[in-house]
Amino acid sequence: MMMKLRSEHISQRLYISMIIIIVSLLFISVPSIVNSYQSYKRAERALIEVSVLRNVAELTNNISRERAPANQVMSSTPEKRAEYIQELKRYRANVDQQIEETAQLLKRNGFIPHAYHLSHQLQASLKEGRDAVDAYAATPQSSRSSAQLDHAIQKMFAAWDSSQYVLKHVMLDSVGKDSRASTYYSVIFILSELRDQAGRVASNIMAAITFGEKIPAENLANSLQNQRQAYHL
């Protein structure tokens, strides 16, 4: 009888000890599990943000590239103008579609103010640039001026600036910018900046060269600044 009671007592103590060990392990492991889950969610969010950032960067690059067909239209001969205008229209349609798709992507991933800027401020700025390009292209050759051409070019610069504003603030407002994926954020932003700065070097002096005039001091300074920024980037 005594042996049975002692055995039951030992079993009870072992059972209590096991419970204490299990509870202790839970207390030790739960914070680790929570931290691992939080790290996983941060990594998942960073992956989403990098994808969003890449899409916005593609849009900014395409807005920058729109200057090429726009410049072709503005500098074309009457014989080639109709062909270049059609190319520009097709390019603009693709950019407009990309703006809509990118705005929807931003909304789906929580970047609501950024999507609004894309759909409103950027659209308005881009329209101003395109209107200036079209106005210059519609002006008779004999009535054109370097000031009007430069105005159109500067307006297209402003459209890109508006798109780059979105890219910059998507990066700044991203959760993962302080994670191990932060390098990707910086690289995407710098490459976008580099591509546009390189394109502006020639565009800033294009109007004066087209009309065989002396390059204005401001345009020359801007072109040199673009060169320096592209070099440092």
Tell where the protein language model's regions lie, with residue ranges.
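Hydrophobic alpha-helical segments
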Residues: 2-233
